[in-house]
Amino acid sequence: MVMKKVYWTLVAIFVAAALGGCVNDPTEMENAPDMSAGSRKILTSAEAEAGELLVKFSKESIAAVEAGVTRSESTRTGIQPFDAALKEISAVSVERVIPVVEQHEADARASGLHRWYRVRFNDQVSLDEAARKLAAVGDVEVVQYDGYVARNFTEMSAVPYNNVWSSDRDQINTRSGETPKFNDPMLNKQWHYKNTGDETLVSPIKEGCDINVEPAWEFCTGDPSIIVAVMDEGVMYKHEDLAANMWVNQAELNGQKGVDDDGNGYVDDVYGYNFAKDQGDITWTDPEDSGHGTHVAGTISAVNNNGIGVCGIAGGSGNNDGVKIMSIQTFAGRYQSTISRNVDAIYYATSMGASILQCSWGLMSGAINSDEQYLDERSIEANAFAHFINTKRPGSPLNGGIIIFAAGNEAGACGYPAAYPSVVCVTSLSTDFTPSVFTNYGMPADIAAPGGDLYYHKNHSDAGQVLSTVLKLDGMYAYMSGTSMSCPHVSGVAALGLSYAKQLGKTFEPDEFRDMVLASVNDLDPYLTGVKKHNNGTMNLVEYKGKMGSGMIDAYKMLMAVRGTPAITVEQDKPTTISLSKYYGDVTALSCMLEVSDAVKDKLGLTFTVEGNNATITCSKQSAGLVTVKSSVGGTSMSREVAIICRAKAASNGGWL
């Protein structure tokens, strides 16, 4: 007999910033509660959805369930003990959590999502009692309570761009003589893309604390075949700086209102689907809508080089070549999705071709304290994640998907689902490489990215947040901060990497690509010393060492990893000696030389000398470029390109990839 599990799910969004003083290692999680078979119990169902339970049937019984539900018009399953329990709780329906769609059914069955059913019954019946009755049936593997996905965006209010900068303010944050890559007028305020250390923008600030995307744009700016599903508030698909990069379901756009024109199980899903309201229309004007999803979307793929607004990391070059944003709406004003609807949302994103699931939401720090507890309490969600990651999409350069989560904003342990190993957990950095005051951190953290830091800066404090697209109410462009804002930087870089892979005709496995993302970083440890003072206290930065993830995401390194080009990071103004012969494995008797174009020399301020097979390189400017290592052995000439990246500080091993 399969052991039964009965769990309660209560989801809380973690966007409020925690601003207290330092505590003793808040990332050390307490021991998880005893969930062994002998002591497992039903947790409180006080906040769960009344009259509803989620049931996962065994592999052996699912065929009978499917046949029974079809015959009985969704009121009985054909499994006598289960049907008897349904009668006792006055069940009114038994339906599959995800829709039955012929073209995607094989994938649903491969992941096991087809075995999850939603049971609805008289809401006057005790949830706990109903759960016990259903769990007692031998053909049931799991009974899980459903619950609404709560949110709290009140601490994340957008600060309109025009409240920070007057419309006639001179451009700043641009080196003398430099021409921006694109003509978007607010790009120079997006320090998180290119940070020149200009203290007229905000202070404190350090040059190079950015995602290094400008040199990456020389190779790739995006690709419309790459789809990023933004699981959040609705994305304002009419926004002037987003409309051209919105994913569009052409069958529904050109179809009949109220009809599922493409037969995918969802009606009128033109730009995605509104799972909060269970409708095709994506909304953003309800009371309590904050523009959160629209801000996240802009960081990933605001349209580049269109002469307005801001830039997106993978927003293209102004030639309809940016990655596409699919709006997976799970919050709409006072409406929230349930955990089962979220599973449906993830299934939808998978089926409709999204390769990246962008998730700036999750549980509060400490709500779940271990992977075991997470799997016990939210197994249906973990099942949906596995489905997204492992399902192949036709024509995609990624043979599956990647899921990217915000770590949370309580200045404590990384929250779940972000801390779950199969997803990427993103922490937040300020303008000077220090952890944001609010960021969660700890061993589950995978990678760091700019997320801003409202309570830290001395002048123009709002400009130390992340600038992106928002709703008309906030002037279309505004600043926000949080791990909600750092997370889409990683999603954007991942999307840029997949775009470049598409351009080069390369494909990657999900684990392989995830490893490439996590390796495409700059070291943070040199900055994690001493004490950081902020408006509400101090932070001992040593406590964050090894707990912010692998490092700060670097878009240029990501593209070099996709390209297959080795990259080395050199420290600004510090001579660095590299062995040129190492690029040719065990070949001996080599004669090597280094070839550098004038353009790369100028961009990096690069000078070098070669002695034997060793080159000593010095760079005076923070940027990146390709050089060529040439060699000969016998009468054969060989060449190999190498990427040189100059940053303010570098890891002791030179940052080899």
Task: Map each language-model feature to its residues.
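Bacterial Sec-dependent N-terminal signal peptides
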Residues: 17-43, 647-657
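Substrate-binding/access-modulating region of protease and related hydrolase catalytic domains
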Residues: 23-26, 218, 222-224, 233, ...
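Inhibitory N-terminal propeptides of secreted protease zymogens
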Residues: 29-167
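Protease zymogen maturation seam
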Residues: 103-118, 132-227, 235-241, 245, ...
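Acidic-leg catalytic submotif of subtilisin-like serine proteases
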Residues: 138-141, 206-279, 295-299, 303, ...
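Flexible, small-residue-rich helix->loop connector segments that border functional cores
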Residues: 216, 231-238, 251-264, 285-290, ...
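Hydrolase catalytic cores
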Residues: 297-300, 326-332, 355, 359, ...
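C-terminal subdomain of the subtilisin-like protease fold in secreted/lumenal serine endopeptidases
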Residues: 354-361, 400-401, 501-591, 655-657
